[in-house]
């Protein structure tokens, strides 16, 4: 009886662990978010082009809203530039071919030679394309 109880306890523990593990789709989205973050930090324009959907709507915490072309142009020209940039406390929710991502945007932004600490919240919408690639279709930042 002790062995049966031990086996059942182990199975319950393991099944809880498996349920808590991220899915492969969540891992793909997390990787896409990381690639976007690194592309923004390092001004990797081809990577930004590859990750942003043509119909992207990119909202800033200031209320400014950009399309794909304007978002990438600001990174390319240095209007949006970063000394450091990372996403923290990320939560990914999947719904069919859409991923909703909430995270904390933590950066040392560069305004000319001035370093500006930036701590805002982000809400991103990613969509899985027919080719299996995840593209950013929407982003809204807000102050907390």
Across the structure, where does each feature detected by a protein language model lie?
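Short, low-complexity N-terminal intrinsically disordered segments enriched in polar/charged residues
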Residues: 15-54
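Short beta-strand edge/turn micro-motifs at domain boundaries
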Residues: 119-144
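Bacterial N-terminal signal peptides
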Residues: 7-16
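A mature extracytoplasmic/lumenal domain signature
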Residues: 52, 62, 86, 91, ...
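Positively charged n-region of N-terminal signal peptides that target proteins for export
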Residues: 1-4
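A short gly/proline-enriched turn/hairpin at secondary-structure junctions
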Residues: 55-66, 78-81
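Surface-exposed, charged secondary-structure patches
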Residues: 76-112
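Hydrophobic pocket/interface hotspot
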Residues: 36, 47-48, 56, 71, ...
